[in-house]
Amino acid sequence: MLWHVIKNLKLTIKETYYSLVKEFGTNDPLKIIKELGIIVQFANLGENKGLYHTLKIDNITYHCIHINNNLSSKEQRYTLAHELGHYILHKGSNLHFLRRVTNTPLSRQEIEADLFASYFIVSDEEIKEINNLTYISESYKLNYRICEKRLEYIFN
């Protein structure tokens, strides 16, 4: 698995999250996305949770995020933050990111986007206070390994 690869990115991802929140005065991923001029569309995406891609028309590049409107509001918030993570962390990589409902192995970019999104969902203080990874993972609908990494980063 690629968990060791993101170890050196932990501060960058965390610092990126905090700098965005400071710059935009909110931790609402939808508000940040709109302020960045990213096009957001909610639609029935079937088994897909969300999608980030770019579209080039007449030498103008548009950044687009599509979110499945069948997701709960919590899942939509997480998916918005996840796709924002792709925009922030992987901009210019010429990759299209499609988030499916299935639990397939994650690429480095998916792990990074999940880690980034987790900061929008649960704070370091809450993780320290609760200190129960299974509870955090289930309550906040986060990947257990992401919760492990967050806890590891807090105490290391």
Task: Describe every region a protein language model picked out.
Residues 1-156:
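Active-site hotspot residues in diverse enzymes, especially metal/ion-binding acidic/histidine motifs
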